From Swiss-Prot:
Belongs to the UPF0147 family. Signal peptide: none annotated. NCBIfam families: PRK04330.1. Pfam families: UPF0147 (PF03685). This is UPF0147 protein Saci_0891. The lineage of its organism: Archaea, Thermoproteota, Thermoprotei, Sulfolobales, Sulfolobaceae.
Amino acid sequence: MSALYDNEAKIRQAVGMLQKIVNDTSVPRNIRRAATDAIRNLQDQTLSPAVRAANAIGILEEISQDPNMPMHTRIAIWNVVSMLETVKD
C-alpha cells in the first residue's frame, strides 16, 4: 500500500507545482490552460495513478514545445514531467 500513497504524494506535489504555473500571470493563457487540463487529469480518481500521470505527461510534453513559453515555466514543466514519470501502478 505504501506505493499507492507514494504515487498519490507525487501527484499532489505535481498538482501544487502546476497550480503555481496556472496562477502566474506572466505565463501565456494557452499554457495556463494546458496546466489546468493536466491538473484536471491528475485529480480524476476514476483512473489509476499511472494512467492519470501518463495523461498529464502527454498534455505537458505537447505544450512544452511552445516557443512563447517563458524559460522558468518550461523548466517547471520539465520538473513536473520528471516527477510524474516515476509514478507506477
